[in-house]
């Protein structure tokens, strides 16, 4: 069975996810996902997207020019077997849209529900589902 080292690697993976999303390092962000990752944001007024090649252009179109700050807290990681794990992360994010957009600001709270797979390149996110508990919006005048 897996070790504390695996948990540490998954924590590092998620930390990279948050940092790379906020710094808009899209090609490096690609590397945190499996090629066939499933992204489900339907509970956040979003959609389901299959594959990193579909997800990244969608993500860039949504937040490419938005200043973002994502934080993950209190991970609950379960090692299923040597090469698979599941996780739930409490999350908080803040987003600031550029001038001229209908939304100015969002402060959100919720959870990431994820699965992970160990690959030859280390642990990767194989599925991600975002759920929201609360959102505070500020709209443009």
Regions found by a protein language model. Give the residues of each.
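Short, low-complexity N-terminal intrinsically disordered segments enriched in polar/charged residues
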Residues: 1-35
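Charge-dense, low-complexity intrinsically disordered segments
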Residues: 4, 46-49, 103
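Intrinsic disorder/low-complexity signal
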Residues: 5-7, 21, 39, 82, ...
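Short linear sequence elements within intrinsically disordered, low-complexity coil regions
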Residues: 22-23, 38, 60, 117, ...
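A solvent-exposed, acidic/Ser-Thr-rich amphipathic alpha-helical stretch
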Residues: 26-93
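A beta-strand edge to alpha-helix "cap/lid" segment located at domain peripheries
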Residues: 63-141
């Amino acid at each position: 069975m897996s070790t504390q080292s695996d948990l540490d690697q998954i924590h590092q993976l998620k930390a990279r996810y948050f940092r790379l999303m906020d710094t808009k390092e899209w090609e490096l962000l690609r590397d945190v996902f499996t090629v066939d990752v499933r992204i489900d944001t339907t509970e956040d007024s979003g959609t389901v997207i299959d594959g990193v090649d579909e997800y990244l252009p969608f993500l860039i179109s949504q937040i490419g020019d938005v200043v973002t700050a994502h934080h993950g807290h209190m991970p609950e990681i379960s090692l299923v077997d040597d090469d698979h794990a599941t996780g739930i992360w409490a999350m908080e994010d803040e987003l600031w849209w550029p001038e001229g957009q209908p939304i100015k600001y969002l402060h959100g709270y919720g959870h990431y529900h994820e699965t992970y797979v160990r690959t030859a390149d280390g642990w990767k996110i194989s599925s991600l589902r975002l759920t929201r508990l609360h959102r505070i919006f500020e709209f443009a005048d």
